[in-house]
Amino acid sequence: MGSFSITLGFFLVLAFWLPGHIGANPVYSAVSNTDLMDFKNLLDHLEEKMPVEDEVMPPQALSEQTEEAGAALSSLPEVPPWTGEVNPPLRDGSALGRSPWDPSDRSALLKSKLRALLAGPRSLRRSSCFGGRIDRIGAQSGLGCNSFRYRR
């Protein structure tokens, strides 16, 4: 009980003593007002020396640039406007009356790909009760969880 009261007393002293010594110190307090004024004068001086963009490029040069861009875009093939339809037009399977990605075809394709992934050698290695390195050791010694899968 004595050590608990000493520890509690120590934490109480720290709780009341530290807030006076630890506080938020803003970053700007480290910079003096004269430094801030010097920085502001430097920025004003740089703004005076920097030309305004409208003065740098006259309107005639801007119109020439837009004409050049329009000529470059006119050589591209025209894209038909969007009609608002969600489904794309039928392509290969339109003669048969069904789309090339019929739901039954898609599910059969997905099932076959999933079976191929699960039957692959890498997925068989991952279906163990230990890590891959321990399974390789177990496969060589015949003591691992899935040692029957690794014998070749």
Curated annotation (Swiss-Prot):
> What residues make up the propeptide removed on maturation?
25-122, 92-102
Q: Which residues carry this modification: Phosphoserine?
A: 128
Q: Which GO terms describe its cellular component?
A: brush border; cell projection; cytoplasm; extracellular space; glycinergic synapse; mast cell granule; perikaryon; perinuclear region of cytoplasm
Phenotype of null mutants? Mice display increased arterial blood pressure which is dietary salt intake independent. During pregnancy, increased blood pressure is observed, leading to late gestational proteinuria and smaller litters. Impaired trophoblast invasion and smaller spiral arteries are also observed in 12.5 dpc embryos. In 18.5 dpc embryos, mice display fewer trophoblasts and smaller arteries in the decidua and myometrium than those in wild-type mice.
| Cleavage (site feature) positions | 122-123, 129-130
InterPro entries named in the record: Natr_peptide, Natr_peptide_CS, Natriuretic_peptide, Natriuretic_peptide_atrial
In terms of domain of life, where is this protein from? Eukaryota
Processing and modification events after translation: The precursor molecule is proteolytically cleaved by CORIN at Arg-122 to produce atrial natriuretic peptide. Undergoes further proteolytic cleavage by unknown proteases to give rise to long-acting natriuretic peptide, vessel dilator and kaliuretic peptide. Additional processing gives rise to the auriculin and atriopeptin peptides. In the kidneys, alternative processing by an unknown protease results in the peptide urodilatin.
Q: Name one GO molecular function term.
A: hormone receptor binding
Question: Which cysteines share a disulfide bond?
Answer: 129-145
Instruction: Tell me where the signal peptide lies.
Output: 1-24
Enumerate the residue ranges of region (Disordered). 76-106
Q: Family membership, please give it.
A: Belongs to the natriuretic peptide family.
Name listed for the protein in its UniProt record: Natriuretic peptides A
